């Protein structure tokens, strides 16, 4: 009897070791953008992406079929639905910025990707492996793309390396073209046409591409999406105005109709532009920042960037990463901010 019990104990111990080993080998640990170590399945098949901008990264990396949850905003992005029409059928378990936890859990995600701290906390409380992919500059963009690729696995890391190299090359191309340029136009970046006094200041990714493109931010205050007065904008009197999340035609119309702002130099000289919008707006947290740096430099310094054909650049990018052949007309619509 003692011998039997001893054998049983050995068997149970061995089974426990094998089970623990199998469990360990079925998961892996990734470090998110905040340094948090998150344990996720070795093979990720189901992704809940609660950060609008990162859905585009998943699409670019070839992981769209793994999306089981997205956001309502992403489902309304025209060019995203054109390039990846399956997105309209993906669940969107959000009410405003609030997670509908039960609905999120129902999607059975292997991993949740987010950027909002409150959402991340809620998701982790629901025992869902949750990764923070947030970034605030171009270096962070590259790291976030690499992180997302590592989560997705498969061919995604190779695509991420290709993309990061292209982003670096485009930045270097702009620097090369502008190295002898002496003018530095002042640029005002307005968040959207709904509130013309909400702008982007220093220490932002917007400020970073303005500088890369050979411009100077007209706003000296720091941070994203800050409110300023019409008087402050009049004092800044920018050479160029770029408005996010709208078309060039609508941006010009909105500023001309504003009695407090229609005498700004950029408005009078017709140097107002809607920021391009593709599968996601280019100006803020976007994988299409690789195109933004080229567009911004050409907008600020058309002569120095005359050899860069933006229609062709957009078409090549979409074919390479989204496997979608844009017409010249479609590329021009994206460049004009028509979404």
PLM regions with names:
Residues 46-50, 68-71, 111-115, 130-134, ...:
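Structural recognition of the beta-strand scaffold that forms the well-ordered cores
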Residues 49-107, 111-116:
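A short, structured surface patch at a secondary-structure boundary
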Residues 98-108, 126, 228-237:
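Short helices/loops that flank or line small-molecule/ion binding pockets
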Residues 120-196, 216-221, 227, 274-338:
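Extracytoplasmic substrate-binding proteins
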Residues 197-263, 269:
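Flexible, glycine-rich surface segments
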């Amino acid at each position: 009897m003692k011998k039997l019990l001893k054998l049983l104990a050995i068997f149970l111990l061995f089974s426990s070791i094998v089970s623990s080993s199998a469990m360990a080998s079925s998961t892996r640990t990734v470090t998110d953008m905040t340094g948090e170590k998150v344990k996720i399945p070795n093979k990720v098949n189901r992704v809940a992406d609660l950060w609008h901008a990162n859905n585009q990264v998943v699409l670019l990396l070839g992981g769209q079929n793994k999306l089981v949850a997205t956001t309502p905003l992403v489902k309304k992005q025209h060019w995203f639905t054109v390039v990846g029409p399956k997105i309209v059928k993906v669940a969107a378990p959000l009410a405003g910025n609030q997670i509908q936890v039960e609905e999120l859990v129902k999607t059975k995600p292997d991993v949740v990707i987010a950027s909002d701290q409150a959402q991340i906390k809620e998701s982790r409380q629901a025992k869902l492996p949750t990764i923070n992919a947030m970034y605030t500059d171009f270096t962070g963009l590259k790291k976030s793309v690499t992180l997302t690729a590592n989560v997705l696995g498969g061919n995604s890391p190779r695509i991420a390396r290709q993309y990061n190299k292209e982003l670096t090359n485009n930045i270097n191309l702009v620097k090369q073209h502008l190295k002898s340029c002496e003018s530095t136009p002042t640029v005002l970046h307005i968040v959207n046409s709904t509130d013309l006094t909400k702008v982007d200041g220093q220490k932002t990714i917007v400020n970073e591409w303005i500088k890369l493109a050979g411009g100077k931010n007209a706003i000296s205050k720091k941070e994203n999406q800050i409110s300023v007065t019409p008087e402050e904008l009049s004092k800044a009197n920018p050479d160029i105005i770029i408005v996010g999340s709208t078309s060039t035609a609508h941006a010009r119309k909105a500023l001309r109709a504003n009695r407090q702002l229609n005498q700004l130099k950029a408005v009078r000289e017709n140097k107002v532009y809607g920021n391009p919008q593709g599968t996601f707006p280019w100006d803020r947290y976007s994988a299409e920042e690789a195109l933004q740096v080229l567009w911004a430099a050409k907008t600020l310094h058309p002569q120095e960037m005359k050899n860069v054909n933006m229609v062709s650049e957009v078409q090549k990018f979409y074919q390479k990463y989204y496997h979608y052949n844009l017409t010249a007309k479609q590329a021009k619509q994206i460049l004009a901010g028509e979404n």
